[in-house]
């Protein structure tokens, strides 16, 4: 078991050796090296890759369409316990790895397809928040003055509300549904990206290399797009990775409350909500979607933590 | 000094004597009323000498079929202290069944006046329990009415709690925190039946779960579309999969246990091919998009709303290629909007009978004034109106047959199921029951302790049930306030605060003799004016006592065919 500090030292030694023997490593390759040295980050990456593959190949992996009701097609009833033939389940009974849900649909297939919804929702939400928040944060930080004041006060107001509560309020206005839940979660996430981007821009625009560009006659647009924003992205990447986990969790929360994905969409939060009344009689139907949510959030959090460490410039020293 | 002491002693003695005299005169005052009545423990009836000074009150609608009033009530008159006469505008065969409904409970006129017609948290009645306190968000606590004229409760305290999830309610029972609960989840039936510490109390409540259409929205304005959906839904599959034992697929809107409920032809059989053809002929060969609206509230007629909605959605897609989006609405908004005919898709709703008469099912839903299914159908409401005013059962029978056949022909809704409902009690409870009509009164349950705890689905909205419609409020009220008649354990109508109500020949005038010597929880004596004033508070919109909780008095309005002095409808 190599300690984290030890792995950093090894990486740095390797890096130094590489520097001496070969041409210098790029920043991204260094980051990748440092990331590979973080076991938890790699575990997180593994989980995320696994989920992405599961989402992409859902039609191949899932034995049934997610919304197919099996009443009259197979000899199964609602909330049947898992039946796995190799584990001794009667061969004459149809195999359902995770059993069936209350509407006699294959639970395993729904869990598999649920990854599509959750990951899509997480990525889109973060992308919207990153683009909008990043844009306003960058402009506010670079321009300053009254524009900065107005934008950041708006962001402060949004941040003043608990995120899930604000998301619920927005969905209440827009109406329940997956799309509106996505918009609500994105709106709630915007201020975090705006603030981080603004802080980065404020620091970078005073850097020597930016001042040098100014002296060389670069326009404001060139400065912002070519010098400032690319160098401000690092913390935003970390924030976005962690943000995916938060977005998935909030989406599941909204769906649990009936404000997110609507039936028959196999969204994990709504699947959990549908079976909450059967916690004692069919605990697995609550456990499986709950575990899927937990695993996804854990994966993104571990990966985010690993990325943060890997991208930390202090670890270059 | 010694003389002073003697004087002091004399004063003390005099004061004690005076105090003793005063207390004995108080006792005389309080016992005066009981002395005037003769009560025997074995018999529940008491007699009292009617007061010659009694001034009877009258509720006068101003005459039947006058401008703006077309309700059932002509006058309600306190003839003497213990006699009330209900003079109605038309014959009313279901009168006794109707007045037994707990909404028409009697409270003392002085209390109604003192609370401005809104005893929302402090009702006063004659029932086996009195309200002690309402801990908002937690429970309602009742104390035993030791002077109850009926069977006095074995427990000193009744606690009514609530938990929205059936699993949560069952857990309360299993953990020993409660003695009884309402409506277990379908999936919990085997657990309950296998548990020797629990008893499942089947509640044969007549109910109906249906999917309704509003014919003012396309494509539901097309009767063939409605018929196609009626034939394209496998109702048996829904009942088999999602309903507990004791449930049945509905052949008619009204359960067959209600007289005339199943007159006429049975509902359409499931035939997906014929349904698809009919839909294509109606101009929708590729189906269409619609919405399924429902509220996520468990009832005996719909034990698993989400599952049933999802299955109907799947069947519509599979059998008719209709894409239905499911929309879960807040309960109050759903009831309000669906009742007003404001939902453009399919709405999943149901009905639990309030009193044992077919009018309670058909007249409420298909009357001329009901807009729930859009424009009302005269082929349905006209025979219903005639039948509701017909005293002779033989004459009424063909009219109900005609109405039921018209419902099948015009398909304002698709009747799905009559749900089997149940309560659960711990095995320790003796005498536990769940009646088909009305609600349990817990003086008949005995857990052998001092306190009995019952868990229901939700908190009561208020404890003044003249202006409430939800079962949770009615259950709480049933412990405190009694009506002139009530339902026994088997659902039969029996006299309660009245000893009998006798009709005239055409059932349009009912004279009720009241039980004498009954005392309200506040100590006031029950008499005919309390009946007239209680009905006035509910029925007369111009009365200063017509306040209530929402002020709608929905049951008074619909069961008496409208309020007296009702404000003119807007627009």
Please tell me what each predicted stretch does:
Chain B
Residues 117, 145-191, 515, 530, ...:
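Ligand-site clamp/hinge motif
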Residues 423-453:
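Long beta-strand-rich cores associated with HINT superfamily self-processing modules
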Residues 121-125, 455-505:
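N-terminal lobe/hinge region of extracytoplasmic solute-binding protein
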């Amino acid at each position: 078991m190599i300690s984290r500090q030890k792995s950093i030292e090894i990486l740095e030694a390797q890096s130094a050796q590489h520097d001496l023997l070969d041409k210098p490593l790029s920043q991204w390759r260094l980051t990748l090296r440092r990331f590979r040295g973080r076991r938890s980050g790699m575990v997180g990456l593994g989980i995320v890759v696994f989920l992405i593959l599961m989402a992409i190949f859902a039609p191949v992996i899932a034995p049934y369409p997610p919304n197919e009701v099996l009443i009259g097609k197979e000899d199964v009833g609602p909330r049947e316990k898992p039946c796995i033939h190799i584990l001794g389940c009667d061969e004459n009974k149809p195999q359902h790895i995770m059993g069936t849900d209350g509407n006699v649909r294959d639970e395993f297939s729904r869990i598999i397809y649920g990854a599509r919804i959750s990951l899509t929702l997480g990525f889109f939400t973060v992308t919207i928040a990153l683009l909008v928040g990043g844009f306003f944060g960058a402009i506010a930080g670079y321009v300053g003055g009254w524009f900065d004041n107005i934008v950041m006060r708006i962001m402060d107001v949004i941040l003043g509300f608990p995120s899930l509560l604000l998301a619920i309020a927005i969905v209440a206005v827009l109406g329940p549904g997956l799309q509106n839940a996505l918009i609500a979660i994105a709106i709630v996430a915007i201020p975090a990206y705006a603030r981080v981007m603004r802080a980065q821009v404020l620091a970078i625009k005073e850097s020597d290399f930016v001042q040098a560009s100014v002296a060389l006659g670069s326009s404001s647009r060139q400065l912002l797009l070519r010098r400032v924003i690319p160098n401000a992205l690092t913390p935003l990447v970390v924030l976005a990775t962690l943000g995916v986990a938060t977005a998935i969790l909030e989406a599941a929360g909204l769906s649990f409350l009936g404000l997110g994905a609507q039936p028959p969409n196999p969204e994990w939060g709504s699947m959990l909500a549908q079976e909450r009344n059967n916690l004692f009689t069919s605990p697995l139907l609550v456990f499986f979607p709950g575990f899927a949510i937990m695993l996804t959030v854990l994966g993104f959090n571990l990966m985010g933590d690993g990325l943060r460490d890997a991208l930390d410039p202090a670890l270059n020293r | 000094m010694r003389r002073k002491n003697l004087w002091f002693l004399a004063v003390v003695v005099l004061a004690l004597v005076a105090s003793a005299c005063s207390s004995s005169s108080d006792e005389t005052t309080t016992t005066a009323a009981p002395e005037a009545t003769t009560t025997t423990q074995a018999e529940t009836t008491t007699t009292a000498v009617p007061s010659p000074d009694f001034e009877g009150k009258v509720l006068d609608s101003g005459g039947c079929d006058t401008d703006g009033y077309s309700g059932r009530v002509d006058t309600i008159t306190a003839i003497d202290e213990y006699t009330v006469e209900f003079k109605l505008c038309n014959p009313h065969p279901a009168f006794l069944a109707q007045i037994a409904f707990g909404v028409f409970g009697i409270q003392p006129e002085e209390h109604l006046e003192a609370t401005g017609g809104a005893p929302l948290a402090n009702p006063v009645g004659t029932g086996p329990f009195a309200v002690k306190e309402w801990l908002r968000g937690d429970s309602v606590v009742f104390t035993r009415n030791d002077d109850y004229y009926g069977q006095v409760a074995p427990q000193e305290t009744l606690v009514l709690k609530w938990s929205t999830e059936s699993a949560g309610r069952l857990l309360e029972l299993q953990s020993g925190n409660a003695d009884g609960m309402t409506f277990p989840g379908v999936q919990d039936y085997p657990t309950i039946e296998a548990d020797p510490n629990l008893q499942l109390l089947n509640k044969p409540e007549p109910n109906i779960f249906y999917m309704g259409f509003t014919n003012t929205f396309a494509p539901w304005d097309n009767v063939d579309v409605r018929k196609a959906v009626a034939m394209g839904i496998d109702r048996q599959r829904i009942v088999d999969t999602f309903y507990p034992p004791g449930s049945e697929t509905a052949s008619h809107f009204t359960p067959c246990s209600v007289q005339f409920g199943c007159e006429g032809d049975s509902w359409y059989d499931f035939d997906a091919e014929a349904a698809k053809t009919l839909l294509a002929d109606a101009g929708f060969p590729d189906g269409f998009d619609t919405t399924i609206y429902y509220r996520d509230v468990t009832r005996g007629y719909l034990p698993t709303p989400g599952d049933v909605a999802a299955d109907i959605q799947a069947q519509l897609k599979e059998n008719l290629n209709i894409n239905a989006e499911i929309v879960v609405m807040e309960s109050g908004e759903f009831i309000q909007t669906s009742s007003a005919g404001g939902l453009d898709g399919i709405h999943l709703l149901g009905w639990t009978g309030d009193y044992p008469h077919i009018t309670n099912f058909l007249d409420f839903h298909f009357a001329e004034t009901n807009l729930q299914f859009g424009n009302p159908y005269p082929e349905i409401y006209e025979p219903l109106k005639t039948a509701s005013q017909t005293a002779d059962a033989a004459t009424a029978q063909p009219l109900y047959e005609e109405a039921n056949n018209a419902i099948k022909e015009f398909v304002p809704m698709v009747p799905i199921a009559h749900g089997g409902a149940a309560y659960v009690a711990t095995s320790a409870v003796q005498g536990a029951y769940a009646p088909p009509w009305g609600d349990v009164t817990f003086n008949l349950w005995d857990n052998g302790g001092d306190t009995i705890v019952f868990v229901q689905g939700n908190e009561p909205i208020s404890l003044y049930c003249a202006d409430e419609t939800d079962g949770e409020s009615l259950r709480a009220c049933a412990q405190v306030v009694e009506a002139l008649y009530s339902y026994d354990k088997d659902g039969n109508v029996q006299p309660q605060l009245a000893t009998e109500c006798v009709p005239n020949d055409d059932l349009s005038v009912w004279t009720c003799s009241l039980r004498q010597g009954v005392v309200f929880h506040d100590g006031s004596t029950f008499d005919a004016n309390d009946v007239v004033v209680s009905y006035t508070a509910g029925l007369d919109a111009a009365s200063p006592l017509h306040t209530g909780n929402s002020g709608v008095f929905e049951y008074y309005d619909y069961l008496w065919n409208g309020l007296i002095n009702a404000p003119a409808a807007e627009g």
